[in-house]
Amino acid sequence: MDNVNKPSFHNVLEFVRMFRRKNKLQREIADNEKKIRDNQKRVLLLDNLSEYIKPGMSIEDIQSIIMNMRSDYEDRIDDHIIKNADLSKERRELSKKLKTMGELK
């Protein structure tokens, strides 16, 4: 009887190990994709900045362009924070409803 349980237990341990590895790989892939997106955005930002900066511009003009771009990006960040909060609220409400539905069964 002990021999029957050992392979089964070993299979469970192997399954758990593989499942954890798969999850770790998914997290690493998502992290790398985020890094790729971030760097692509940086390249795009530099391209946009180089389009605005023209020969003969004063330092004040360039600083003004940078300040305006920064303000635009900060506004976008605020919009994303608000959207995330709304999505989190909806997710919590759905979780509560699902929990209630599960308790009714």
Swiss-Prot record:
Signal peptide: none
Coiled coil feature spans: 22-42, 70-104
Record's GO cellular component terms: cytosol
InterPro entries for the chain: DUF496 (IPR007458), UPF0265 (IPR053375)
Pfam families, A to Z: DUF496
Compartment annotation: Cytoplasm
Keyword annotations from UniProtKB, A to Z: Coiled coil, Cytoplasm
Protein family per UniProt: Belongs to the pole-localizer TmaR family.
Known function: Pole-localizer protein involved in the regulation of several cellular processes.
Protein name per UniProt: Pole-localizer protein TmaR
Organism: Photorhabdus laumondii subsp. laumondii (strain DSM 15139 / CIP 105565 / TT01)
